[in-house]
Amino acid sequence: GSKIDTRAMEKIIKDVGLLDHRTKYPSQLSGGQRQRVALARTLMENKPIILLDEPFSSLDARTRLEMQDLVTSQFIGKTVLLVTHDPNEAVRLCHRIYIFDGQEIESTESLVGPFPKNINDNELHILQAKLLDQIRGNAL
C-alpha cells in the first residue's frame, strides 16, 4: 500500500476538530464526530471527483458551518457532488443545483460565487426561497 502522510493526517484531524479524540474507538465517538471522521477520510484521499452524501447532517449548527467552510476551501478546483436535503446548504455551497423528484431530474439555474455564500447575505435568502418554491412545484 501507499505510505500515509502523518503530517497531513494530523492537520486534517485538527481541521475537523477531532485532535483530542484521535485515540478513541469509533464506538466512543458521537454521531457528529463520526461524521467528521468520514469527512477527514475524504479530505485525506485528495481525489479530483468527490461524492458527499449528507456530509453535515449529524452536526450542530456551528460545526456544520465550520465544516462547510473547510470543505469549500479544501475542494477548490475539484468536482464535488453534494447530496443534501437542506436547500440552504445547497444554495450556500453549490454552483449548480439539481432537484430529484422520483425519477425526474430538474436542473435549476447555475449559481455564481463566491462560495460558500455568507449566511447573512440577503441573496442567499432569496435563492433559498426560490429553490423552496421550485421544490414545492411552484413556478419560478
For every predicted segment, state its role.
Residues 50-54:
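Catalytic Walker B motif of ABC-type/P-loop ATPase nucleotide-binding domains
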Residues 77-84:
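Conserved H-loop
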